[in-house]
């Protein structure tokens, strides 16, 4: 008779065995079982812990660096939005910030904390009873990805807080970074292995934290700095002391934090780090200024996008001189061909730059670029390298002028340039591999079909001739996927489930995903609101389309051209047969007709509702939104920081400016 093992004993036995195999695999590099056996035991342990939660333990292998290499990331709503900061670039704008804060506090004195602005990936950590329970990326500020398993691998992130005076529930926000030294090591390794290089440490940190395998994350030695605490329970009385409190609890807080009682002290801090930041081990892109007292922060509040009690000062971009080797070209999903400058490697803002943007053919002609030229390179906002000048005095007599390519670099089709367009395009939309793969990646994005698949898998499927257009995703089978290297049943099932779920995505998301030229997320939403099915949109005329707000002749022509092509009509029919949503589930019905016949422009920032909420309220009450002020504008819903050009035009045309309080009273009457 088979001996029955109690669940608690089996759980501990599995943990012991898994820990031993983790040690042999990751420390000794001498595994004694294959991945299938390891995954089977891990799955059994996960199932037992779910069935017997009383035997769960924070040090279980299921709570640490996981073995599940195919698991995606769950979306999590932030308890408090992770807003961005308003930027300022000179001392006059800092003076304006001081004035706004003083007015908001009715002249009361205030202190400012000056801190380094780290250039990485924003993260929110949640601790319960001193234990790390969740780590969520900033995402769109409202929703982020749960990357707890990956964050646990970062040694500067405490898994358990030090001391015993921390609150029961604590949120800590900070920045995940890849040190310059690690960035150079990883790029050297990728170059040796023939893999594409990371553009900068920020992209590398973001790409690393989104890895599906936490072991890869652990091998990249990410770092983290922290700068904000929140709890419903008492914390230190001011922001500066809370940072010191965080340091005591085991968080890495920068030494570059100063309490300032005057603008002059702020300016001194900024001047000091204008040079010192270049010697730091991690990337920074400015200074953050925060009102020190939380009570005063609460009084100042927030706009729809950012806190009124904080601002970011951005340093001027660093400029260096290097040699232009040659120009290469990239093809985007719409066929636009973009030139790229290949440079002698040069260090800018702590990263090695080898390539820079050249924008288009006009830019090359305007700069009169020659091969071998010495050029001046900056990083716009400390991130995107760009050429800003040419040292013509140092030009070699042998340097040949750079002439924009006449052929597609991917499929050798002659390029075309439409009248009024800056870019050259490859017209071979159906036969150009880079365009095809670009459209496939675009369709799978979170704001489109939201299919959980990465560029590497798309490249693999494309190379095996399994996909050529977006309808091919819906014809994939488990048998096909299991022939791919690295794909097992679970990975295949997850991808197929994600593809199946995409069929229920909103019509406007699918419309955006089709990749119609000039039809971005906002335009797709506007088109879907007027034409609630793909068939209705396909039947629209140019005259009808240009009547829609913000849709001009160029977008209308692109829409008509898309539906005029036989291959696109066949694509839509295949999507329809696959069950993809190609019409809106419900047609929006006005809540009231209070704004019937009214054309409304929204400008500025608001306290009570977001701009999107106000737009919805206008449309729900029969009104029409417009993006610019004209004689047809009925009124402007004007928030703070309203654009000066719109205000000037409104005054000139006699258009009424309505406050949000007046607008809400109008709607609620």
Curated annotation (Swiss-Prot):
Q: Which protein, by its recorded name, is this?
A: DNA ligase
Cofactors required: Mg(2+); Mn(2+)
Give one GO biological process term. Answer: DNA replication
| The EC number(s) this enzyme carries | 6.5.1.2
Please give the PROSITE patterns that the UniProt record associates with this protein: BRCT, DNA_LIGASE_N1, DNA_LIGASE_N2
Q: Mind giving the lineage of the organism this protein is from?
A: Bacteria, Pseudomonadati, Bacteroidota, Bacteroidia, Bacteroidales
**Region annotation Disordered: where it falls in the sequence:** 52-71
Key words, A-Z: DNA damage, DNA repair, DNA replication, Ligase, Magnesium, Manganese, Metal-binding, NAD, Zinc
Asked if the record carries the keyword Metal-binding, the reply is yes
Q: What is the species listed in this Swiss-Prot or TrEMBL entry? A: Porphyromonas gingivalis (strain ATCC BAA-308 / W83)
